[in-house]
């Protein structure tokens, strides 16, 4: 009975560690999706303003360049090589 209790405790710890890792990955991916949506909205605003007025908005371009300069959220996720 003692070894069964130890095995149960060890398995609970392993499951907890796996859950933390999975939810961390989910959070990172969710943040990347939100960031990409923000960039897409800025592109749309710049396109609309360029079509309406003939020139692009400086504030939107600065905001977009600031987002793009933030770099990658995770150093192991480099797809632009």
Swiss-Prot record:
Its membrane topology: Single-pass type I membrane protein
Keywords, alphabetical: AIDS, Apoptosis, Host membrane, Host-virus interaction, Inhibition of host innate immune response by virus, Inhibition of host tetherin by virus, Ion channel, Ion transport, Membrane, Phosphoprotein, Transmembrane, Transmembrane helix, Transport, Viral immunoevasion
Chief subcellular location: host cell
Protein name: Protein Vpu
InterPro entries: Vpu, Vpu_cyt_dom_sf
Record topological domains on the Cytoplasmic side: 29-81
Entry's family note: Belongs to the HIV-1 VPU protein family.
Subcellular location: Host membrane
One Gene Ontology cellular component annotation held by this UniProt entry: host cell membrane
Recorded domain comment: The N-terminus and transmembrane domains are required for self-oligomerization and proper virion budding, whereas the cytoplasmic domain is required for CD4 degradation. The cytoplasmic domain is composed of 2 amphipathic alpha helix that form a U-shape.
GO biological process annotation, one example: receptor catabolic process
PTM (free text): Phosphorylated by host CK2. This phosphorylation is necessary for interaction with human BTRC and degradation of CD4.
SUPFAM superfamilies noted in UniProt: HIV-1 VPU cytoplasmic domain (SSF57647)
Source organism per UniProt: Human immunodeficiency virus type 1 group M subtype B (isolate ARV2/SF2)
Extracellular side: 1-7
């Amino acid at each position: 009975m003692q070894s069964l209790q130890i095995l149960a405790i060890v398995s609970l710890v392993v499951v907890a560690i796996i859950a933390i890792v999975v939810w961390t990955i989910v959070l990172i991916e969710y943040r990347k999706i939100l960031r990409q949506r923000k960039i897409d909205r800025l592109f749309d605003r710049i396109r609309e303003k360029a079509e309406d007025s003939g020139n692009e908005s400086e504030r939107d371009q600065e905001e977009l360049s600031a987002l793009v300069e933030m770099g990658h959220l995770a150093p192991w996720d480099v797809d632009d090589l």
